[in-house]
Amino acid sequence: SMSDLGVTITNFGDEYFEWKTRSGNTARINFIKFTEKTSPGGYLQYDCVRENFALKPKNSNDNKIVAASSGTGFFISKQGHIVTNQHVIDNCSSVKVNFYGKEYDTQVISSDKMNDLAIIKTNMNPEKVFSIETEDASLLEDVIIAGYPLGKKVSASIKTSKGSVTALAGYGDNFSEFQTDAAMNKGNSGGPIINQKGNIVGVAVAAYGKKQGVESFNFGIKASTLKTFVTSNGLEFLPSNKKELSNKDLGN
């Protein structure tokens, strides 16, 4: 199912980690689910898709809290490679994946700050992984964003939103991104944007701040940018599906 294809990443950042000498700077990931990180975003005029909330570390008698935020990652290889946003794992000294209650160590394979992409690897071998579309999404093409908006505050179940591609460039005419009106909220960072064939057409990256009174200004990193990043790291991806799927099949 779609919920088997992604991960939750938790990153406790240096700025707020007050137990650093005792428990270290750790990121924890639970499968597709959301990712959690700390430091504020540096995106021009739009807010990085993340949330801030208080998180108390396990096995701590200290009443201090750690600030965290959330995002999403997804598998692209059966060797356990996971794609997410670079800002999700930024400033993280260790990353662990929790899959059906079992925790796995991970390794950061590559990080691209300019395109906000990262690849991490677990020692798991997932049965299903995402394929990447051969061409970038077209204007008005239907897309689905999957992930964990608001993290686990709502539920541990994967959530989806549906919309279309509304522009072929991102903020400031960034042609490595596209714009969509599919709902994107805090916790969607790094999540897959898929088409009706079930292929990846983008990676959720940012939403224009609603404080500016603007709705549906959400952005995804294009499939072509993702493919270049993946192949430049010596990885292959699955051939794209050619046939459109029903909504039921997409969910399964």
Predicted feature locations:
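Surface-exposed, beta-sheet-biased, low-hydrophobicity segments with strongly acidic/polar composition
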Residues: 1-55
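Conserved hydrophobic positions within beta-strands
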Residues: 31, 73-75, 106-108, 165
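Short, solvent-exposed secondary-structure boundary/capping segments
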Residues: 37-49, 116-122, 173-181, 214
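C-terminal cap/linker of serine protease catalytic domains
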Residues: 56-63, 106, 127-128, 149-153, ...
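Short, small/polar residue-rich loop motifs at catalytic or cofactor-binding pockets
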Residues: 68-70, 91, 185-189
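Short, acidic, Ser/Thr-enriched surface-loop or helix-capping motifs
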Residues: 77, 160, 195
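Conserved active-site neighborhood of the chymotrypsin/trypsin-like protease fold
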Residues: 78-155, 173-177, 234-247
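Catalytic nucleophile loop of clan PA
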Residues: 183-204
